[in-house]
Regions:
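Flexible "arm" and connector segments at domain edges
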Residues: 1-151
């Protein structure tokens, strides 16, 4: 997946954000990563993949896509904050793990980025997140189209 334009569009969207002026770089980083954890949790909740009990509720694919795009926006914002916008593209790979394991791995990726921030950890986060999208049946075209439609 090509990321250059997504980073540029996210930068435009972020111009409207009013960031608290009393936050130092550490606190801002921590809050951005906490926000990412929340967005990923919202996505996991939408998929209902965590439920180990019988549930007759169906999942709404449009709602899942919305939550996926919200998390993607947050991931792009973290990448910009960390200065990783020179990543041109990421290959979307299939994953044999169940969806709940993929989400758990994503939380590990976020923690790795918090404790020992590096471009490699960010790339792993992107790869694992895009892999979740593929497991959800989302193609690159669907993801980009939904991202473009998001206000």
């Amino acid at each position: 997946m090509k990321l250059n334009n997504l980073f540029k569009m996210q930068a435009e969207r972020n111009k409207d954000l009013k960031v608290l002026t009393n936050l130092d770089e550490y606190k801002l980083n921590a809050r951005k990563l906490l926000a990412l954890n929340v967005r990923v949790g919202n996505l996991a909740n939408a998929t209902k993949c965590f439920k180990y009990w019988e549930d007759s509720e169906t999942t709404d694919p449009d709602y899942i896509l919305q939550k996926y795009i919200n998390a993607l926006s947050c991931i792009l914002t973290v990448g910009m904050f960390k200065g990783y916008t020179d990543i041109d593209s990421i290959e979307i790979k299939s994953n044999d793990y169940c969806l709940s394991d993929q989400f758990l791995n994503l939380y590990v990726d976020i923690n790795d980025l918090l404790t020992t921030s590096s471009k490699d950890h960010y790339i792993t986060l992107l790869e694992d997140f895009l892999s979740i999208g593929k497991s959800l049946g989302l193609t690159e075209e669907i993801i980009i189209d939904a991202y473009l439609k998001q206000s």
